[in-house]
């Protein structure tokens, strides 16, 4: 969404451009999951029997919240053409879901559902970036990314974005990197987008999705060894970003 204006591709054209790199990332992820976790020697079991699906307790509530998700996705896609703001789409979907719970299961609505700490943290990151830009972040990103519109520039953009994402967060990292990419270099800009989406899996704060995942792991008392997380994330960030950028350039 942050990249929509600069990339300047219609929804279908953007999906067609990114589809193959996305498949490359998924393939790399599956290979690494097999290497690190799915192999018989690693899992310690002969077979894996998945648990039975949880039954739907309230089909009306399930349908209403499902409709809220579809509304959100539809509004995002429509917003590319109509200018609907992300905040408006998110608010509308949230209102539908909250009203549904208020009618069907009011006890489920509680302040603890809102990730207040993460909201403050991410907001703070966006405030930090302008300060860092005043002290040379823009110059540093331009030096790292360069102006080459070819393969070297694409690789530099992807890995610079991935690196800064793991230091700060991928949202401000993309904003900082975007300003360093020359306007005509579309492949370099898409490579930056790839790096800031595939790469931030090394540190817990690399992306909002990872922060939310860690938060729910904590709530459910699921222990995540930090050493394993960092090592596996490093391998995935490097190989996944390289594969995605390679396919992006080959299919461009």
PLM regions with names:
Residues 1-7, 159-185, 189-220:
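Alpha-helical membrane segments and immediately flanking helix-loop junctions
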Residues 11-22, 56-61, 78-91, 110-115, ...:
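Interfacial loop-to-helix junctions that mark the boundaries of transmembrane helices
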Residues 24, 59-62, 66, 120, ...:
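Catalytic cores of large soluble enzymes that bind and process phosphate-bearing ligands
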Residues 3-4, 9-60, 198-252:
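Juxtamembrane and boundary regions of transmembrane helices in multi-pass small-molecule transporters
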Residues 71-187:
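Transmembrane helical segments that form the transport core of multi-pass membrane transport proteins
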Residues 4, 17, 21, 25, ...:
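Alpha-helical transmembrane segments in multi-pass membrane proteins
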Residues 26-105:
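Long, contiguous bundles of hydrophobic transmembrane helices that form the permeation core
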